[in-house]
Amino acid sequence: MPGDHRRIRGPEESQPPQLYAAEDDETPAARDPTRLRPVYARAGLLSQAKGSAYLEAGGTKVLCAVSGPRQAEGGERGSGPAGAGGEAPAALRGRLLCDFRRAPFSGRRRRAPQGGGGEDRELGLALQEALEPAVRLGRYPRAQLEVSALLLEDGGCALAAALTAAALALADAGVEMYDLVVGCGLSLTPGPSPTWLLDPTRLEEEHSAAGLTVALMPVLNQVAGLLGSGEGGQTESWTDAVRLGLEGCQRLYPVLQQCLVRAARRRGAAAPP
């Protein structure tokens, strides 16, 4: 009897999804504390946005878009003397607005479309505070730039990945910046001999005693932001963590440079002669 080619033929055998699901009591495996997960970055993905970037770091996937500059709300303020370099005075400097959201399917448990609440607002504020030192807001008087970060999959170090992707999106949008911002996350293993792990996975974060996110402007060699939580022990322990995070940021910087160069070449090739 001839087969019915109009239908999609499924596999002859199937397995229940529980067979491949991770156990809830799974513990992180031992690994090199200085290793970085493989990173993939691409800028200029969204044609509707002024600038955009997509970043994968291990199992973490983030998409960022930049819009503006547009006139800020309440932007009709008085004028003042111009600052150095043709920038507007401090009272007229532009504003950077950052929004961080998680997709409903980003974690192991599905979230409500408007879920997240205070945690997402806190991460959005941390994103804004780390990006502001790198953006020349004085060149955009009475204007605002909007950065939207969407976490598609949370595989660990979500804030660090969002920071890096947002900086790429700002650069892709042609926003004037002093430097890029590179983010790196760390987690402290519990136990009698705690160790800081660079670029932890979601599982390592869940089993950690403390966490830290470092944001660096690598060319200027200036720290743009720090966000820590948990019990990290002595001050020397946190100092070692910051140093390890800064080294990780410097190692990631060449990947971001190549990403922006490739995006510029694609844009140049697509431009009409």
Swiss-Prot record:
Keywords: Cytoplasm, Exosome, Nucleus, RNA-binding, rRNA processing. It comes from the Eukaryota. GO terms for molecular function: RNA binding. Disulfide bonds: none annotated. It is found in: Cytoplasm; Nucleus, Nucleolus; Nucleus. The keyword RNA-binding applies. Gene3D superfamilies: GHMP Kinase, N-terminal domain. Transmembrane segments: none annotated. Belongs to the RNase PH family. PANTHER family: EXOSOME COMPLEX COMPONENT (PTHR11953), EXOSOME COMPLEX COMPONENT MTR3 (PTHR11953:SF2). Component of the RNA exosome core complex (Exo-9), composed of EXOSC1, EXOSC2, EXOSC3, EXOSC4, EXOSC5, EXOSC6, EXOSC7, EXOSC8 and EXOSC9; within the complex interacts with EXOSC1, EXOSC7 and EXOSC8. The catalytically inactive RNA exosome core complex (Exo-9) associates with the catalytic subunit EXOSC10/RRP6. Exo-9 may associate with DIS3 to form the nucleolar exosome complex, or DIS3L to form the cytoplasmic exosome complex. This is Exosome complex component MTR3.
